[in-house]
Amino acid sequence: MATFQSLPGFREFYPDALARRNHIFRLWRQTAVAFGFAEYDAPVLEPLELYKTKSGDEIEAQLFSFTDKGGREVALRPEMTPTVCRMVGAKANALKRPIKWFSIAEYYRYERAQKGRERAFFQFNADLFAEPGPEAEIELIALLTQCLKAFGLTEQDFYIRLSDRNLWFFYLEALGLDEPRIRAVLSAVDKFEKVGDDAFKPYAEQFGPLDLALKQRVLEFLQIKTLASLEQTLAPLGGEKLAARLGDWRKLLDGLAAMGLSPFIEVDLGVVRGLAYYTGFVFEAFDRKGELRAIAGGGRYNDLVKKLGGPDLPAVGFAIGDVTLGLLLDARGLMPAFVQASDVYCVIGGAAERQAAFADVNALRAAGFKVDYPLKDVPFGKQFKLAADSGAKLALIYGPDELAKNVVKLRDLTTRTETDVPREQVQAMVRDFFSTD
């Protein structure tokens, strides 16, 4: 007989796993709403061209794509940013600004399944449109930090690495590189931490080996860890645009400090983000012990709305993945144990008593109580074991004697005390029991 298993990288959520997922979603949603963000959703299937031209080569290589029955080339979404930019661009004139949106959705990437990485995964995405200044980054980084602190994580558990593609462009242009070479160098910088010098091989294949002196300057820039060092290194370049950009850095770091977030922030120019559309500040969150891949990442993408046919609208966004976050919460002992427990269990004597119990079961459920009962006739002794296994705190006993007296016996399953209650008072007594529990 054939057996079927789920596909590699696609998770099945049994009730306990789904309870964990819902816990994560609930705190994400609660935090975003507290920051004034509105929730949205979008199609899971999109035109293939949306990602081929906007997300970059790495994402394109990971797409689940096919030709549908109408002859259209389509793909399961690997990310949300192009979609939300299209949505905002389509109704930009009607939307109240700044536009602060979030979503919790599933994404698909055909890559090797490994620790912290699946082929189907959920992300919390938050984006802020129509604010060109660093005030937007302050708000987004504050939201990211709180989305992780909400689970009990502290500055001892995670930190956020902050970088700037703009400053990289200023610096590399000053070293004499044109835009194609700058992008190739940034691609190498993005991978340097993982693979070392091998990160520069694609540059060499495309343009020839990078000049050793220039490469040394790149590696020195990578080592900068403070704003003061940034200013000192870039001071000889001069220019109003560079001065303004360094002013943005001061405003951003001062704003984060005023929010009390400095313990979470590290200047780290090794973060450039691989996606093609980032244009300014970029940031990633990591666990302090360095045991996991990035927990979250994002940055500014000022050109994408316009490239997708909308108005010229600046934007910043980030995403947190559920897989790595779940691993971190487990490692820190911060994922609660989820037990599905009833409030009330009905112990039923037989067919006649069952009919009487059904009215109370239905009324109590309608009143918001979690009520369970045996679906078939079972001996009383076994029913009390079922009641204990259900996690219920209260048992309602419907036996022949109780039915004859038009009462129900209430048993406190913790203290084992029992009380006879008139049928018409059952709901009120149950409510009183749980209000004083």
Swiss-Prot record:
<keyword id="KW-0030">Aminoacyl-tRNA synthetase</keyword>
<dbReference type="InterPro" id="IPR006195">
    <property type="entry name" value="aa-tRNA-synth_II"/>
</dbReference>
<dbReference type="InterPro" id="IPR015807">
    <property type="entry name" value="His-tRNA-ligase"/>
</dbReference>
<dbReference type="InterPro" id="IPR036621">
    <property type="entry name" value="Anticodon-bd_dom_sf"/>
</dbReference>
<dbReference type="GO" id="GO:0006427">
    <property type="term" value="P:histidyl-tRNA aminoacylation"/>
</dbReference>
<keyword id="KW-0963">Cytoplasm</keyword>
<comment type="similarity">
    <text>Belongs to the class-II aminoacyl-tRNA synthetase family.</text>
</comment>
<dbReference type="InterPro" id="IPR004154">
    <property type="entry name" value="Anticodon-bd"/>
</dbReference>
<dbReference type="GO" id="GO:0005737">
    <property type="term" value="C:cytoplasm"/>
</dbReference>
<dbReference type="Pfam" id="PF03129">
    <property type="entry name" value="HGTP_anticodon"/>
</dbReference>
<dbReference type="Pfam" id="PF13393">
    <property type="entry name" value="tRNA-synt_His"/>
</dbReference>
<keyword id="KW-0436">Ligase</keyword>
<dbReference type="InterPro" id="IPR004516">
    <property type="entry name" value="HisRS/HisZ"/>
</dbReference>
<keyword id="KW-0648">Protein biosynthesis</keyword>
<dbReference type="InterPro" id="IPR033656">
    <property type="entry name" value="HisRS_anticodon"/>
</dbReference>
<comment type="subunit">
    <text>Homodimer.</text>
</comment>
<protein>
    <recommendedName>
        <fullName>Histidine--tRNA ligase</fullName>
        <ecNumber>6.1.1.21</ecNumber>
    </recommendedName>
</protein>
<dbReference type="InterPro" id="IPR041715">
    <property type="entry name" value="HisRS-like_core"/>
</dbReference>
<dbReference type="GO" id="GO:0005524">
    <property type="term" value="F:ATP binding"/>
</dbReference>
<dbReference type="GO" id="GO:0004821">
    <property type="term" value="F:histidine-tRNA ligase activity"/>
</dbReference>
<keyword id="KW-0547">Nucleotide-binding</keyword>
<dbReference type="InterPro" id="IPR045864">
    <property type="entry name" value="aa-tRNA-synth_II/BPL/LPL"/>
</dbReference>
<keyword id="KW-0067">ATP-binding</keyword>
